[in-house]
């Protein structure tokens, strides 16, 4: 069976994950004056939102492997991926800097200039200091990881394409075990100081588990392996609904695991199964609501949506009457309305950035160049997955 160039259902999944990130960040700035509603939102979303990071990193590895390296040029690949990442990161960073300077309020920084250089170079995730990775536009830390993944991808791709087909599942299992074990390794790190926003979590351990690019590379590699399994016709896993049920069961178990372990690590293998099972549906021509034109379009907007949504929530709340360190709260109807307004603004701005900034930049600077050993056409040219 010939493999399709595009996997539309994965685009739909990308947007659903971005929506979870949005609602998770909404819950951290409680709009609702009703404390019961705030608690009901925060209880699952504070746990579910970060899990989308695993999905996005796996998705990135999956779609890049699906596209492959058609011209076999590492330099061309690195250039295209860097241009695509910076096409939106730079303008959003500039707007963020202007807002921070206008308000004279650093975002987790000690001064308004904290983190500017590391954010500009997208190396903030390499520093175990929340004044760096939490400064400016805090969600951009994941792009710091993505650039590291891009740097490693040509070498990893060359290696895994040579792995024997009958050993792919063993590799996937080994990487899954490694990812689940990372919180145990983190216990070797100092237990103090704690995170400013979570006194029960040591700052260095949290950075190592959640931010450190080589650690998050495991999820990217797992996505690559699942793509190889699907490409080579070795998928024998459960269907999407069964994967969703399995994820729900494991997710419920995570609430019984201490926070300092990072319970979300337990869901990594299940997310990998869900990702591959949805992709297999596309390969087999199974129609899904995730693959409709609307969902695919929303998926294309996800990178821009991810980069702007937190700024709209954070500073929208600030301009609506909140102050630094204080989140104004509203009655339920007003809070619902403001949440919908924030989502609408984020989606509208992401559409503008995608069509009038990202795409023109890619047409001008990100166009593939022919190399002497150019090969076949890629199955697709994936966008940055976007992460919380």
Swiss-Prot record:
What positions belong to coiled-coil segments?
A: none
Q: Which PANTHER family match?
A: ACETYLTRANSFERASE (PTHR23028), ACYL_TRANSF_3 DOMAIN-CONTAINING PROTEIN (PTHR23028:SF53)
Keywords, ordered alphabetically: Antibiotic biosynthesis, Transferase
The role this protein plays is: Catalyzes the acylation of the mycaminose sugar during carbomycin biosynthesis. Recombinant strains containing care can use spiramycin as a substrate and convert it to the hybrid antibiotic, isovaleryl spiramycin.
Q: Which GO terms describe its biological process?
A: antibiotic biosynthetic process; polysaccharide biosynthetic process
Q: Which organism is it from?
A: Streptomyces thermotolerans
Residue numbers spanned by region Disordered: 366-388
An example of a Gene Ontology cellular component annotation for this protein is: membrane
Report the EC code(s) recorded for this entry. Answer: 2.-.-.-
Q: Which InterPro entries match?
A: Acyl_transf_3_dom, Acyltransferase_3
GO molecular function annotations of the record? acyltransferase activity, transferring groups other than amino-acyl groups
Q: What is this protein called?
A: 4''-mycarosyl isovaleryl-CoA transferase
The protein's gene is named: carE
């Amino acid at each position: 069976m010939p493999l399709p160039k595009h996997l539309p259902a994965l685009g739909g999944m990308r947007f659903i994950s971005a929506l979870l990130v949005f609602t998770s960040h909404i819950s951290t700035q409680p709009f609702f004056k009703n404390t019961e509603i705030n608690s009901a939102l925060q209880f699952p979303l504070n746990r579910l939102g970060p899990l989308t990071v695993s999905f996005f990193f796996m998705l990135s590895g999956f779609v890049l492997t699906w596209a492959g390296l058609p011209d076999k040029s590492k330099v061309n690949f690195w250039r295209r991926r860097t241009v695509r990442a910076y096409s939106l990161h730079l303008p959003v960073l500039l707007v963020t800097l202007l807002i921070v300077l206008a308000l004279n309020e650093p975002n987790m920084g000690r001064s308004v200039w904290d983190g500017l250089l590391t954010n500009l170079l997208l190396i903030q995730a390499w520093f175990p200091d929340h004044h760096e990775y939490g400064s400016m536009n805090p969600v951009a830390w994941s792009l710091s990881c993505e650039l590291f993944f891009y740097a490693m991808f040509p070498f990893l791709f060359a290696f895994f394409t040579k792995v024997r087909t009958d050993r792919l599942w063993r590799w996937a299992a080994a990487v899954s075990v490694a990812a689940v074990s990372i919180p145990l390794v983190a216990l070797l790190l100092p237990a103090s100081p704690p995170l400013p926003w979570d006194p029960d979590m040591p700052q260095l351990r949290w950075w190592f588990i959640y931010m450190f690019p080589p650690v998050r590379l495991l999820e990217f590699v797992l996505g690559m392996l699942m793509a190889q399994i699907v490409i080579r016709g070795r998928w024998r896993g459960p269907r999407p609904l069964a994967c969703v049920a399995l994820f729900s069961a494991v997710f419920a178990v995570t609430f019984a695991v201490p926070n300092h372990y990072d319970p979300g690590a337990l869901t990594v293998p299940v997310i990998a199964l869900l990702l591959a099972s949805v992709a297999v549906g596309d390969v087999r021509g199974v129609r899904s609501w995730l693959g409709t034109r609307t969902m695919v379009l929303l998926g294309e907007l996800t990178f821009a949506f991810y980069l702007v949504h937190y700024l709209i929530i954070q500073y929208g709340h600030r301009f609506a009457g909140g102050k630094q360190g204080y989140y104004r709260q509203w009655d339920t109807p007003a809070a619902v309305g403001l949440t919908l307004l924030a989502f609408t603004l984020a989606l509208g701005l992401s559409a503008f950035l995608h069509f009038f900034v990202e795409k023109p930049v890619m047409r001008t600077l990100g166009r593939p160049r022919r190399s002497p050993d150019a090969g076949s056409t890629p199955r697709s040219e994936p966008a940055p997955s976007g992460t919380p």
